[in-house]
UniProtKB/Swiss-Prot annotation:
This is Probable AP endonuclease. PROSITE patterns: AP_NUCLEASE_F2_3, AP_NUCLEASE_F2_4. GO terms for biological process: base-excision repair. Belongs to the AP endonuclease 2 family. Zn(2+) 1 binds at residues 78, 271. Consistent with its intracellular location, ASFV encodes its own replicative DNA polymerase and three base excision repair enzymes: a class II AP endonuclease, the repair polymerase Pol X, and an ATP-dependent DNA ligase. It comes from African swine fever virus (isolate Pig/Kenya/KEN-50/1950) (ASFV). Transmembrane segments: none annotated.
């Protein structure tokens, strides 16, 4: 279920004021049809991203709900960068996250992505316990990017430890968002097919702890070296993870990720936020044509 991040700044019609997210999704769907890659998923912001402010209006909610149903889209919202329930401001933050979850349910958005912190699993679990759950909406914990912290959640061992604690705490509706650029930045080599395969086989070995029905992906190349700790996305086969495989794409680690995503029907989002809509659509056209060749 491949798709992309839909920024209303880059996707909505000029002059749009009240239904910009729904309008962006309409243009995004039309673009997918134009490049002959019908999108199955999308990611949006309904709040923030840098402030704790809901930015979807009532009229937009109604139109977005219709758009999601009409095109049978799997849509996830990305939480704001302040959505850190294990922080010192957790009382305000957890209330705000609950508001985001309620909006997600109202319009048919399947989940909310939160950035994992580089903190101990027990602190993350305690933070999650403070969030009032909303039925049918999954909180996806996104693998972070860091270099020096003990808890990077880029290794299968640490992911397993965290989700065992989540399961033992009887928390429901908690999933995992694997960002390929982040785990690379945290020191996991997923460049070649065998390298990525080893990591993904280890992930399959803990499906009893975190099932694929609760796993999604941010499918990004990276503009920095493995283990840099820096989060800088690049287009597929244009960054330092997979560029060396651009002429032998089925030997790349990306192909192994595509196989896993297809085998388990996981949503996968390309996160691109370039300077103009033309630049963005040009880059995405190339990337989705490449994905189409990997799916053959």
């Amino acid at each position: 279920m491949f798709g992309a991040f839909v920024s209303h700044r880059l996707w909505s019609d000029s002059g749009c004021t009240t239904t910009c997210i729904a309008n962006s999704i309409a243009n995004y769907v039309a673009f997918g049809e134009q490049i002959e890659f019908p999108f199955k998923s999308a990611q949006v912001f309904i709040a923030g991203p840098r402030k704790a402010v809901i930015n979807i209006q009532e009229e937009d909610k109604a139109e977005l709900s219709k758009m999601i149903a009409k095109h049978n889209l799997w849509v996830v919202a990305h939480g704001t960068y302040l959505d850190v329930p294990w922080s010192s401001r957790s009382a305000f933050v957890t209330h705000f996250i609950h508001q985001e979850l309620l909006i997600c349910k109202e319009v048919g958005i399947k989940g909310l992505v939160l950035h994992l912190g580089a903190v101990e699993p027990e602190l993350i679990v305690e933070g999650l316990k403070k969030i009032k759950p909303v039925e049918e909406v999954v909180i996806y914990l996104e693998t972070p990017h860091n270099k020096h912290h003990a808890y990077k959640y880029s290794t299968i061992e640490q992911i397993k430890e965290l989700f065992l604690r989540i399961r033992n705490s009887r928390l429901k509706h908690i999933g995992l968002c694997i960002d390929t650029a982040h785990i690379w930045s945290s020191g996991v080599n997923i460049s070649g097919y065998n390298d990525a395969g080893q990591w993904l086989r280890s992930l399959e070995n803990i499906h009893s702890v975190i099932p694929p029905s609760h796993i999604m992906f941010h499918l990004n190349d990276a503009a920095t070296e493995c283990g840099s700790g820096i989060d800088r996305h690049a287009s597929l086969f244009e960054g330092m993870i997979w560029k060396s495989y651009s002429h032998k794409i089925k030997h790349s680690g990306l192909y192994c990720f595509v196989e896993y995503i297809t085998r388990h029907q996981c949503p996968a989002i390309l996160e691109r936020n370039l300077g103009s809509s033309m630049q963005l659509q040009t880059a995405l056209t190339t990337e989705f044509h490449t994905l189409k060749s990997l799916l053959k």
